[in-house]
Amino acid sequence: MARKYGKAARKCSRCGDHSAIVRRYGLNLCRQCFREIAPKIGFKKYN
């Protein structure tokens, strides 16, 4: 039975990890995967 709420309810769509999920804009990526592919999908880092 899948979890319906809580931290383990969602997983990274790229690696399957359950921790530190970025859900904004429907990304559903963990923070590590987001950092790897952010430039490819159009995110820029400003200082």
Swiss-Prot record:
Keywords: Metal-binding, Ribonucleoprotein, Ribosomal protein, RNA-binding, rRNA-binding, Zinc. GO terms for molecular function: rRNA binding; structural constituent of ribosome; zinc ion binding. Its cofactor is Zn(2+). Zn(2+) binds at residues 12, 15, 30, 33. It holds the Pfam family Ribosomal_S14. GO terms for biological process: cytoplasmic translation. InterPro entries: Ribosomal_uS14, Ribosomal_uS14_arc, Ribosomal_uS14_CS, RIbosomal_uS14_euk_arc, Ribosomal_uS14_sf. Binds 1 zinc ion per subunit. It comes from the Archaea. GO terms for cellular component: cytosolic small ribosomal subunit. Belongs to the universal ribosomal protein uS14 family. Zinc-binding uS14 subfamily. Part of the 30S ribosomal subunit. Binds 16S rRNA, required for the assembly of 30S particles. This is Small ribosomal subunit protein uS14. The gene is rps14.
